[in-house]
């Protein structure tokens, strides 16, 4: 094929020699390989009979810009001279190849406007790779301080906005193949280098694409095939069968595959998995039956031109999987989902494996991938070059002999939000994140622990509450109301270490993470000696790193944050890690004192916080009805929400965690069995249980007065309140009473005596009835507090929406606001519109980058910012029930939810409305064992999987029918 292409290019000599020439402008940073590529391109054009002038940037500087320096201004002037010279030479009818840095948008735009035959080729190389090569020693001199004004280091490099061709040179560039791609630009009608142009191989049907790639691949191989159309089969199936059987492999096990014209991007859509493939077929009769099955799967949208192809079955498989060469949002990542356990080729595509792995790697850092995946990435890079497409979906398999097979390749079916020229911004942003991780991981004089790690789920789990890519307004409000200061004030009040002035949550370019070292410090009881505190924090961090699936269960499985009846047994684990009996006694005593202070008597801390929440409910009408402007009303709603809402809520949330841990300890020491523990949880009277009852009993108007402020996304201005879109959430014609009465829980006399005895033995200063009251009130109080404070927050969001509308901003615009803008407007006299518009513009720009960033759920080192495996997740199974039902997602029409297992992104209590829709069960991507929705599921008796994690959530959501087996704690894909 390459020979034919070169013959085609040789026909360029027939062109009119007097026609204007073309300019091939090869640009990139110093050391990218521009000169090498330019010389080879010049030689090939010259061999084709073209008149060629090759201009190298260093030579040009010596001839026409000798007096200029290397400042940004001088470099711009030099680049413009190069551009004008190229224009002049091209007017004479010859082609010009110019290899130059010249990374200025101004120059690139001038070239496009003034040079008719302009072709822009961008050689893209990451800085780390350039520093490694450094053939001219430039980067080494910069590092020593002997050089300055180097583009990409201390001078900005303006990557081309719309290059005709991007060539990624991460290692040894295949110069010949690169020149083929450049020459192919000349053959395209408009010369445009869009993502799918200038390809050596064009995407066709699945079978045709594989057939075209087979003789060209160097880093993989393609299984042989027999291909035929539907009309071929219907015309003479005997002849087709004879061809299959006559193949050298035809009498062995084969796979019969679809190759429809409407799949794999042939018609602009992938239709992945829509049509059948039949594996492991042997013999003429079985093959004929399999072919009929595949044709039948084309159904009504098939045609006689659709194809079927048969290949030998790949039986001895060491690894198989799927690679995306872009993230779903268009970010520059390789995403490899693979199975190296089952020995089968279809576990990933079927979503049926329990041991599937997912690896993500920034495309500019291929060296960071494990050796077992290096050859897979090499194959994908080669396919990107051959297909001239940097967004592809590749299925592969590795035989047990180490041979790599390409099973399928198609354009990646994603909706582009940002152009690929933002890849450099992504790389720069991730470099900044890695640097921040390194800085925050250093020892700190006011923190215990020798290292830091970061997670999306521990402690105040932002992934559950605001999401992993929250809108700027959501992120800034969560910081304002919880994670900047409130969290630390309340934890200090409850007897833990004083972490005031430490933000709990950091933002990595808009991705929220908990600083886990700060969090673990805050759970050390006040009074614990510094040496013991430091060793405890290090132990907690090491434990989380060794068992990352516990990241949403740290308070139950890793740290010791309160005294429970099973604490001595739980502490035996740390005794195995160098903690002495004296250490255990000191920690145990501190936890006992802290717990007694929180739960004891009428002066218990949780009682005071419960009273403050009621005060917020009383103050809300005062702010609502005050004769103050909208900005002031927003400001005071948030201020009151902090002081009388989230501050006591943080305390009640702490009490709620302690309550659940105490209840679990009843089960662990044998006072209650697991069924009795579940019955207690089902007997708790929370907002979640009352909302279903009130929906059946109250009028629509009264129901919305009580619950109308709730939103599925508590901090999300784009999430309508219940009273803004009631018919979206509720089926008012089907308001039926709860199917069963609330559970009744009672302790036997013997159980009461046993608990009383244990309380005395463990020196907990509370009687059994008061303890039961605390556990019940702790769980209920946490839910009630959130219900109350979210009313103030929801009102503030509605007012922000109104404020935006008054100044020409849509509600979508308002999502990009930072709450700092409201605070500025309250305390300063600036133009309201200008402040809002500027904040929206900044937020929109930042969030565009945030959408393209992917980070692991736990970051333990700077290197993990660029390449990582998604850790296995250990979901939380709620109830001991089982259910088998079809699947639905929260974005589907609500009327379709009844009788289905519903997929919900987070465990936010604003999703309470789903419980009025008759769902059979639900699964959340994020959320912990003690999350709001876990409590809802427990009290309502609905089977649920809370915190499935990204990989399993996406896999299960893609199924048609699931079984949630909460008894055995497993999820089965039924269809």
Where are each of the predicted segments found?
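Hydrophobic anchor at the beta1->P-loop junction of P-loop NTPases
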Residues: 26
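Conserved divalent-metal-coordinating catalytic cores
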Residues: 192-220, 229-234, 267-268, 287-293, ...
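Conserved substrate/cofactor phosphate-moiety recognition/catalytic segment
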Residues: 39-84
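Conserved lysine of the Walker
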Residues: 34
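Extreme N-terminal, non-catalytic leader segments
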Residues: 1-23
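Conserved phosphate-donor/acceptor-positioning beta-strand/loop module used by diverse small-molecule
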Residues: 99, 114-133, 167
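Extended, domain-scale alpha-helical bundle/helix-rich regions
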Residues: 665-669, 747-852
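Small-molecule kinase domains that catalyze NTP-dependent phosphoryl transfer to phosphate-bearing small molecules
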Residues: 127, 132-183, 188
